[in-house]
């Protein structure tokens, strides 16, 4: 049972004010030192990660997200160094104007203050959140899942040791206990926490949205579609579908449903051919099932049910939906999308333009795999999450998306009556 956490929240809030005094040069030095420590402490971090892995069935779709390796830690260290090379998002002049009475107004970017992150079995998020929050001048409170508790504790202990060497208040990053009481406390930490960002399943995101008393930016849940249009190129479609589905099945930008125009059902076996090697189970509607029967392995071909559509599989599974028209494809996406990433494969430019205008999603692709929905791929550096809402940010959230602004007004004794 978690004890009262208000003392912890107050300590983080106080540390956030100290963080505002750090120079960008010092912040960059800390980030590079954390990258060095990540490599130096690889054995320790991996040994703690193994404890978490030992408690999880390897067939669990979360297993790949939970697993850290030497190569992944090298990638994390490289990402941390990359954040250090990015320009500071703070103190940017967003707008400048003067009023007739002589007042000068300047709109300046500033940190949010304290950001709470609630996430599941993804220990790499601990690194990403810390590096982005530090660079943007935000203190952070991390609430990881019990599946990754040993990994997260190891990571935060490594970060705290670096902060101590720089004489920086370690409360700028705090890891909460991995229990539900801590989640409830964080969601109700009004007066201490400025923003909550959940990263994980739709169940987690819905719970946070329904129970938080603090502003929330929803991220993570991705029910992604690729529509193979009447005018689609078969080779491009096959490559895009295979990549979007199998690159990493456990991530939110992975493909969940291929929609195909009925005039192109004859191309469906070719479009799905590469999926056989990855042993992707296909849940096909009646027309798609008939088109694939005899071409796709029988043990991997299943009739679709209503539940097959609108499902984020996070596994080697994919639904196939047949439509009579472009409009029907748009309707299916509208009904089942989580507004994350949607793709059309077509050689018809007018059709592509209509798709990008009409489809309501954070990222809309033409002839490109949805696997590219990622902060680094967008040139933003690491990301704190992928927002599926419209306020305050949308899509991959880099440094700029976790800042706010203030108006600074200068004058010479002006008054208003």
From Swiss-Prot:
Subcellular location: Cytoplasm
Enzyme Commission (EC) number: 1.2.1.41
Catalytic function, reaction form: L-glutamate 5-semialdehyde + phosphate + NADP(+) = L-glutamyl 5-phosphate + NADPH + H(+)
InterPro entries recorded: Ald_DH/histidinol_DH (IPR016161), Ald_DH_C (IPR016163), Ald_DH_N (IPR016162), G-glutamylP_reductase_CS (IPR020593), Glu-5-SA_DH (IPR012134), GPR_dom (IPR000965)
GO cellular component assignments: cytoplasm
Gene Ontology molecular function: any one: NADP binding
Domain of life: Bacteria
Associated pathway: Amino-acid biosynthesis; L-proline biosynthesis; L-glutamate 5-semialdehyde from L-glutamate: step 2/2
GO BP terms: L-proline biosynthetic process
Broad EC category: oxidoreductase
Keywords, comma-separated and alphabetical: Amino-acid biosynthesis, Cytoplasm, NADP, Oxidoreductase, Proline biosynthesis
Keyword DNA damage recorded: no
Record HAMAP family: ProA (MF_00412)
Record family assignment: Belongs to the gamma-glutamyl phosphate reductase family.
Biological role: Catalyzes the NADPH-dependent reduction of L-glutamate 5-phosphate into L-glutamate 5-semialdehyde and phosphate. The product spontaneously undergoes cyclization to form 1-pyrroline-5-carboxylate.
Protein name stated in the entry: Gamma-glutamyl phosphate reductase
Organism this protein belongs to: Bacteroides thetaiotaomicron (strain ATCC 29148 / DSM 2079 / JCM 5827 / CCUG 10774 / NCTC 10582 / VPI-5482 / E50)
